[in-house]
């Protein structure tokens, strides 16, 4: 019997990006609405990307088929 390929989770593929070095880049949450009460500094930092932490890396890679 042929081996079945895993499908990529499309919602995860739109939210995460694998860099050339193999790190997984993500964007910070909390900047879409209710921004009037947030400081300019906080909103500026929310615009920047960050990387997936080591303890979540295995789960995200499974969603992206990155084994």
Swiss-Prot record:
Q: Where is this region: Disordered?
A: 22-45
What would be one Pfam family of this protein?
A: Ribosomal_L35p
Claim: Ribonucleoprotein is one of the keywords in the record: yes
Keywords on this record? Ribonucleoprotein, Ribosomal protein
Q: PROSITE patterns annotated for this entry?
A: RIBOSOMAL_L35
- Which GO molecular function entries does the Swiss-Prot or TrEMBL record give? structural constituent of ribosome
Reply yes or no: does the keyword Ribosomal protein apply: yes
Ranges of Basic residues compositional bias?
A: 35-45
**What's an example GO cellular component term for this entry?**
cytosolic large ribosomal subunit
Biological process GO terms, please? translation
Top-level taxon of origin: Bacteria
Please give the HAMAP family that the UniProt record associates with this protein: Ribosomal_bL35 (MF_00514)
Family membership, please give it: Belongs to the bacterial ribosomal protein bL35 family.
**Name this polypeptide is given:** Large ribosomal subunit protein bL35
State the encoding gene.
rpmI
């Amino acid at each position: 019997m042929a081996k079945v390929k895993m499908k990529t989770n499309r919602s995860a593929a739109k939210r995460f990006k694998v860099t050339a070095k193999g790190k997984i880049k993500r964007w910070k949450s909390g900047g879409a609405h209710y921004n009037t009460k947030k400081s300019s500094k906080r909103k500026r930092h929310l615009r920047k990307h960050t990387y997936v932490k080591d303890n979540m890396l295995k789960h995200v890679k499974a969603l992206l088929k990155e084994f």
